[in-house]
A protein has these predicted regions:
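Short, flexible loop/turn elements at secondary-structure junctions
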Residues: 8, 103-108, 119-121, 144-148, ...
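Localized chelating/binding microdomains
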Residues: 13, 20, 88-89, 190-193, ...
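Signature of the catalytic double-stranded beta-helix
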Residues: 49-112, 126-134
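Catalytic core of Fe(II)/2-oxoglutarate
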Residues: 168-238
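Catalytic core of non-heme Fe(II) oxygenases with the double-stranded beta-helix
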Residues: 110-191, 235
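Extracellular structured ligand-interaction cores
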Residues: 97-99, 137-143, 152, 205, ...
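N-terminal auxiliary "cap/dimerization" subdomain that precedes the catalytic jelly-roll/cupin core
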Residues: 1-66, 70
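Solvent-exposed loop and beta-edge segments used for protein-protein assembly and interaction
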Residues: 94, 136, 215-217
Length: 238
C-alpha cells in the first residue's frame, strides 16, 4: 500500500503552519546541538522505546494531547474523515495514546544526508489498549506535509517488508540488519506534496528522504501518525 490522499488546501496548510509556530513554547527539542529538530507532541519512536533516559511517552502525551486537541481539533476531524472514507472503516484516537503530532526542521538543520532506514514497529512499545483484539499484521503510517523546504521532500522505500526480515531470521537463525538487506533491493522515491497525505504500511522498509541542499530560510513541517486496526476500527496515534 502506498496511497496519496488530498487533505488540506495551501491556505489551510498555512493556517496549520502559523498555529505550529504560535505553539513554539510546546516544541520538544530532539536531535543534536548541531542538527536539532523538534516535535510537537509525544513521538512513540523516541519517547516509548527503551533507551536512556527511561521512556516518558505516557507522561509527555498527558501534557501535549490537550494542547494539540485544543488548537488542531478541526485538523484531526478532517484527517479522520479522509482516512475513514479511504479505508472504509471507523477511524478514532485513544486517550492512552499520543495524538498525531508534528515534526519540525528549520533552516540548515533540514536533513541533507540519509536518515535511519527502518520499519515502524512502535506499536510494540506503547501502552496499547485492547492488545488481544489488535491486528498487528497490517499497521499504517502516514505523513501530511504542511511546509516543505526549497528542495522538496519525500520518502524512500525499498521492496522489503518486516515479514521478510523476520522470515529470513527464522530460516537462517541469523539477524541481518535491514541496511544490509536493502542493498540488494530496489529503492523508490515518493515525493511529497503540500497538503496531500502519504499513507503506507509501516512494515515496508522506508526512510525520510534527504534534500540535496538546505537553505537558511528552509522549513519542513509534517503531521505524523500511525494506525492499527483494533476491535473493528482504525486507531491512529503517534
Amino acid at each position: 500500500m502506498f496511497d496519496a490522499i488530498p487533505v488540506l488546501s495551501s491556505a489551510e496548510c498555512e493556517r496549520v503552519r502559523q498555529t505550529v509556530h504560535a505553539l513554539r513554547s510546546s516544541w520538544i527539542a530532539r536531535g543534536s546541538a548541531d542538527y536539532p529538530f523538534y516535535t510537537v507532541g509525544a513521538a512513540s519512536y523516541i519517547d516509548a522505546v527503551s533507551r536512556t533516559p527511561p521512556p516518558r511517552y505516557s507522561e509527555i502525551l498527558v501534557e501535549t494531547n490537550p494542547v494539540l486537541r485544543e488548537h488542531f481539533h478541526w485538523l484531526y476531524a478532517r484527517l479522520m474523515n479522509k482516512l475513514s472514507v479511504h479505508l472504509q472503516a471507523v477511524v478514532r484516537t485513544a486517550d492512552e495514546l499520543a495524538l498525531p503530532g508534528f515534526h519540525v526542521w528549520q533552516g540548515l538543520s533540514v536533513p541533507t544526508s540519509s536518515l535511519s532506514v527502518h520499519f515502524d514497529l512502535q506499536y510494540m512499545s506503547i501502552p496499547w489498549p485492547d492488545v488481544p483484539r489488535s491486528d498487528r499484521s497490517q499497521p499504517l503510517s502516514f505523513t501530511l506535509p504542511i511546509a516543505l523546504p526549497r528542495g522538496g521532500g519525500g520518502l524512500n522505500t525499498w521492496d522489503l517488508s518486516y515479514e521478510e526480515q523476520a522470515a529470513h531470521f527464522q530460516a537462517t537463525g541469523k539477524f541481518t540488519p535491514v541496511e544490509e538487506m536493502a542493498k540488494s533491493r530496489t529503492r523508490t522515491f515518493h515525493p511529497y506534496t503540500q497538503g496531500v497525505l502519504t499513507l503506507h504500511s509501516g512494515h515496508t522498509l522506508h526512510q525520510i528522504a534527504a534534500v540535496d541542499q538546505a537553505y537558511p530560510d528552509d522549513e519542513r513541517i509534517t503531521l505524523q501518525g500511525h494506525g492499527l486496526y483494533c476491535d473493528g476500527a482504525w486507531t491512529i496515534y503517534w
